[in-house]
Design a protein with these regions (language model features):
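Short beta-rich binding modules
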Residues: 1-106
Length: 106
């Protein structure tokens, strides 16, 4: 599924090209890369239709063990690179940014 898993693969994740997101909004995005995080999360790199490149961490839900935002059925651990989505990003009460919803862009 294109997830970087080995130490060497993780070291080559393009953090400099895809900095963590620091804004809210709804974006049409393409999944460009992904790597397992240090917790029960996957870090996904996206490129928005407007050219914005960013990463966001998606944590595993306890109820179904999917790496999915909110009530979305999309498990980003299983999605192939190049897949397009409409995603909503919000700022949490603790000041972090997260994906709150995702749908396939058709």
């Amino acid at each position: 599924y294109g997830v970087r898993t080995t130490v060497l693969e993780k070291e080559t994740y393009p953090y400099h090209e895809y900095p963590f997101l620091h804004q809210t909004g709804i974006f049409n995005v393409t999944l460009k890369d992904k790597v397992w995080g240090k917790s029960v999360n996957i870090i996904c790199a996206f490129e928005a239709d407007n050219g914005l490149k960013f990463s966001i961490s998606i944590f595993r839900r306890k109820r179904d063990e999917k790496y999915a935002p909110g009530s979305s059925a999309i498990d980003f651990a299983l999605e192939p690179l190049g897949t397009k989505f409409i995603c909503t990003f919000v700022k949490t009460t603790s000041g972090f940014y997260k994906m709150s919803d995702a749908e396939y862009l058709i």
